[in-house]
C-alpha cells in the first residue's frame, strides 16, 4: 500500500510518500510545496495544484493529513484551515480516502511522546525509513503522518506493530517509549 502524508501550511506544505508492506516501511519521496508571496487565492491554488501533481505522479492508495489546531491567533488558524482545505481538495480530486490525525497523535505514534520536538520527529523518521539524510521538518512531519496512518494512528499499537522494523535498526519499545 502506498500512503501520502501531508503537513499543511499556507507558506510551506510538506508531503511524504511511503510504501507499506506488512510492518516494512519504504521511503518513496518527500518534499515541500512552497507558495508564492501572492494573494490568498493564488497560494491556495498552488497548494491544490501541488498536491494534485503529487497524487498523479506517485499514485498513492490513501492519504493522511494533520488536523488543524486552534491557535492563539484566530487569523492564523483560519489561514491554516484554508491551506488544509486546499490540500484535502487535491487529495479528494485524486480519488483518495483521507484520514486525519492531530499533532499529538502523530508525535505519539512516531516518537512515542506527544510533546516531541521537531528534531526528535526528524530523527525518528530518518531511523524508521532508513534515510541517508535527515528531511526538513515539514517533509519529516508529512512522512511521519504517513507512518502514523500506516499503523492506525494509535501509539501503543503503532510502537508494538513497529517492533520488527525497530529491532532491525537497533531500537525497541519499553513501557510505551522508544529506547535505543
From Swiss-Prot:
Main function: The RuvA-RuvB-RuvC complex processes Holliday junction (HJ) DNA during genetic recombination and DNA repair. Endonuclease that resolves HJ intermediates. Cleaves cruciform DNA by making single-stranded nicks across the HJ at symmetrical positions within the homologous arms, yielding a 5'-phosphate and a 3'-hydroxyl group; requires a central core of homology in the junction. The consensus cleavage sequence is 5'-(A/T)TT(C/G)-3'. Cleavage occurs on the 3'-side of the TT dinucleotide at the point of strand exchange.
Coiled-coil blocks: none
Enzyme class at the top of the EC tree: hydrolase
UniProt source species: Burkholderia cenocepacia (strain HI2424)
Family, per entry: Belongs to the RuvC family.
Cellular component per GO, a single term: cytoplasm
Family annotation (InterPro entries): RNaseH-like_sf (IPR012337), RNaseH_sf (IPR036397), X-over_junc_endoDNase_Mg_BS (IPR020563), X-over_junc_endoDNase_RuvC (IPR002176)
UniProt protein name: Crossover junction endodeoxyribonuclease RuvC
MF terms in GO: crossover junction DNA endonuclease activity; DNA binding; magnesium ion binding
TM annotation in the entry: none
Residues that bind Mg(2+) 1: 7, 138
Named cofactor requirement(s): Mg(2+)
Active site: 7, 66, 138
The enzyme's E.C. designation: 3.1.21.10
Cofactor binding remark: Binds 2 Mg(2+) ion per subunit.
GO BP term (any one): DNA recombination
Gene behind this protein: ruvC
Chain residues that bind Mg(2+) 2: 66
Catalytic activity: Endonucleolytic cleavage at a junction such as a reciprocal single-stranded crossover between two homologous DNA duplexes (Holliday junction)
Subunit structure: Homodimer which binds Holliday junction (HJ) DNA. The HJ becomes 2-fold symmetrical on binding to RuvC with unstacked arms; it has a different conformation from HJ DNA in complex with RuvA. In the full resolvosome a probable DNA-RuvA(4)-RuvB(12)-RuvC(2) complex forms which resolves the HJ.
Main localization (coarse): cytoplasm
NCBIfam families linked to this entry: ruvC
Keywords annotated in UniProt: Cytoplasm, DNA damage, DNA recombination, DNA repair, DNA-binding, Endonuclease, Hydrolase, Magnesium, Metal-binding, Nuclease
Localization in the cell: Cytoplasm
Pfam families given in the database record: RuvC
Amino acid at each position: 500500500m502506498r500512503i501520502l502524508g501531508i503537513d499543511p501550511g499556507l507558506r510551506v506544505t510538506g508531503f511524504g510518500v511511503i510504501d507499506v508492506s506488512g510492518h516494512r516501511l519504504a521511503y518513496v519521496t518527500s518534499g515541500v510545496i512552497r507558495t508564492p508571496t501572492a494573494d490568498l487565492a493564488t497560494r491556495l491554488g498552488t497548494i491544490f495544484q501541488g498536491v494534485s501533481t503529487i497524487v498523479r505522479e506517485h499514485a498513492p492508495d490513501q492519504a493522511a493529513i494533520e488536523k488543524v489546531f486552534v491557535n492563539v491567533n484566530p487569523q492564523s488558524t483560519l489561514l491554516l484551515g484554508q491551506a488544509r482545505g486546499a490540500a484535502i481538495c487535491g487529495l479528494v480530486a485524486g480519488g483518495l480516502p483521507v484520514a486525519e490525525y492531530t499533532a499529538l497523535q502523530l508525535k505519539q505514534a512516531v516518537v512515542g511522546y506527544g510533546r516531541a520536538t521537531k528534531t526528535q520527529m526528524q530523527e525518528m523518521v530518518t531511523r524508521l525509513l532508513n534515510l541517508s539524510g535527515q528531511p526538513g521538518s515539514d517533509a519529516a512531519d508529512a512522512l511521519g503522518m504517513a507512518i502514523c496512518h500506516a499503523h492506525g494512528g494509535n501509539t501503543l499499537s503503532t510502537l508494538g506493530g513497529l517492533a520488527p522494523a525497530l529491532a532491525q535498526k537497533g531500537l525497541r519499545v519499553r513501557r510505551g517509549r522508544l529506547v535505543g
